[in-house]
UniProtKB/Swiss-Prot annotation:
The gene is folE. This is GTP cyclohydrolase 1. HAMAP family: FolE. SUPFAM superfamilies: Tetrahydrobiopterin biosynthesis enzymes-like (SSF55620). Pathway: Cofactor biosynthesis; 7,8-dihydroneopterin triphosphate biosynthesis; 7,8-dihydroneopterin triphosphate from GTP: step 1/1.
Length: 190
């Protein structure tokens, strides 16, 4: 599989008018393979294994928010990067998940070919199903290189998506608290 991938990169270089055998490009097919292997490593990771090993009994029934989780992903339409921050909250239902597992969950789905809308939904659904939370809220703010580098070429534009499940969707006060915590946190830095 690696050789086939590297041959495709060589062919692409030739098609755009480059010499894949020149000094600066000779190892490029291998570098590109390793890069894409890493950037798409989320396909080989199991969400249940990541989350189920870190569920702990708890009487906490208040919102848990992990904000400003930096991520990068690849747009499935152009294979160009998009990157930003995810804010993920849930309300426990007798169990809490280890805090480091929430950024790991974001990484699992971000390291796949994606669109932001789907990424947001997948994170929310995986947390809801695997943690049995009373509710989940996810907001992602991201910049897309397919928007900034090509097409409309609008630098620094940000796309915001949200996915709400359970009590976050049904209860206005919970939803307002979630959005308020995300927005107020933007002014506080340690």
């Amino acid at each position: 599989m690696q050789k086939k991938f590297e041959d495709c990169v060589k062919t692409m270089l030739e098609i755009i008018g480059e010499n894949p055998n020149r000094e600066g490009l000779i190892k490029t097919p291998n570098r590109v393979f390793k890069t894409y292997e890493f950037l798409t490593s989320g396909y080989t990771q199991n969400v249940k294994e990541i989350l189920n090993d870190a569920l702990f009994e708890s009487s906490n029934n208040e919102m848990v928010l992990v904000r400003d989780i930096e991520f990068y992903s690849l747009c499935e339409h152009h294979l160009l990067p998009f990157f930003g921050r995810a804010h993920v909250a849930y309300i426990p239902n007798k169990k809490v998940v280890g805090l480091s597992k929430i950024p790991r969950l974001v990484e699992v789905f971000a390291r796949r070919l994606q669109i932001q809308e789907q990424l947001t939904e997948q994170i929310a659904q995986a947390l809801m199903e695997n943690v049995d939370a009373k509710g989940v809220g996810v907001v992602i703010e991201a910049r897309h290189m397919c928007v900034e580098m090509r097409g409309v070429q609008k630098a620094n534009s940000t796309t915001t998506t949200s996915a709400l499940r359970g009590i976050f969707l049904k209860n206005e006060k919970t939803r307002e608290e979630f959005f308020s915590l995300i927005n107020s946190a933007k002014q506080v830095r340690f």
